[in-house]
A protein has these predicted regions:
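A short glycine-rich, His/Asp/Glu-containing loop-to-beta-strand
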Residues: 19-52, 59, 143-194
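Glycine- and acidic-residue-biased ligand/ion/polar-headgroup-sensing regions
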Residues: 56-78, 169-170, 181-228, 233, ...
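Conserved metal-binding segment of the jelly-roll/cupin
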Residues: 87-107, 222-243
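Double-stranded beta-helix
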Residues: 110-150, 209-211, 249-293
Length: 293
């Protein structure tokens, strides 16, 4: 269900790009999103192709979703990539400050997310390798999920925050429902957020409920592989359909470099349920599995 005007505004479906073709898989600008924070896109390159850009007046993070590539940022050059896809291991990522040139050359077919926010800070480009990412297992029972932090609040960036979340088949995540739409530190900060979805099988799906604190808006989105959801305010829990593991890439930016959020008070007691962790978690490890490139 995604019939309301609000649901149509915040749900962006993937472009129809053939698996053996390069192109932009999904994209949203700040103007399109009607916020002043995040530009987000996902691209695919075929082996031998390259893509050039410049961060200009933004800081950027490129998260390699799968495949191998070389990245050149003017004064640095690295080969990155190990996992075949997001379900095969932790990511490589590249952080680039404002006014930095960028070239990505595909060694294999590769897909990468490009997240950018306005910035004037002259910081240092950095390669983030799988061992640099921090894992956290949250929840218990059928609310167990795995978080892989890529750019944490303590990372030397100006605004960007990025993590990957893995939700096993049938489980809930972003739960208890929480929001981050008020600047009231340290309890909560005002953050815009993207959810970029990948599903373990092409026919799989997930649901995400979007509702506000006042009870004036309540939408449920049906999400398939490649969908992008924009979280501007309100609560936004997720559940994975039985039989399909769900991945989403979160990019956040806003009033502070903090992940502080407030739970829906009706469900806050579920945060410390005391249930044992789902033994299927973690779904991925830092070292790439046999599915990796």
């Amino acid at each position: 269900m995604a019939g309301s005007s609000y649901a149509q505004e915040v749900l962006i479906h993937a472009a129809k790009v053939a698996p053996d073709k390069s192109g932009v898989l999904v994209s949203v600008t700040r103007t399109q999103a009607r916020w002043d924070t995040i530009n987000f896109s996902v691209r695919r390159l075929i082996a031998g192709q390259y893509w050039q850009s410049d961060t200009r007046d933004e800081e950027a993070a490129v998260v390699l979703l799968g495949g191998r590539a070389t990245v050149n940022w003017g004064h640095g050059y690295r080969e990155i990539g190990a996992r075949r896809d997001v379900f095969s291991g932790y990511p490589y990522a590249v952080y680039l400050p404002c006014h930095t040139p960028l070239e990505i050359s595909a060694l294999t077919t590769c897909e990468f997310a490009d997240a950018r926010v306005p910035s004037s800070a002259r910081l240092t480009p950095r390669i983030i390798e799988p061992p640099d990412c921090r894992e956290e297992i949250r929840g218990g029972g059928n609310c167990t999920r795995q978080i892989v932090d890529v750019i944490r609040p303590e990372f030397p960036a100006e605004k960007l925050l990025i993590c990957e979340v893995y939700t096993p088949s049938g489980n809930w995540s972003s739960y208890p429902p929480h929001k981050h739409d008020v600047h009231n530190p340290p309890k909560e900060v005002d953050l815009d957020e993207t959810y970029y979805y990948r599903i373990s099988q092409p026919e799989g799906y997930a649901f995400q409920r979007l509702y506000d604190h006042a009870g004036t808006r309540d939408d449920t989105l049906t999400l398939v592989d490649g969908d992008l959801v924009l979280i501007k305010d309100g609560y936004h829990p997720v559940v994975a359909a039985h039989g399909y593991n769900v991945y989403y890439l979160n990019v956040l930016a806003g009033s502070a470099r903090s992940m502080a959020a407030s739970d829906d008070p009706r469900y806050a007691h579920l945060r410390n349920s005391g249930l044992e962790r789902d033994p299927r978690v973690p779904l991925v490890r830092a070292e790439p599995t046999e599915r990796s490139a």
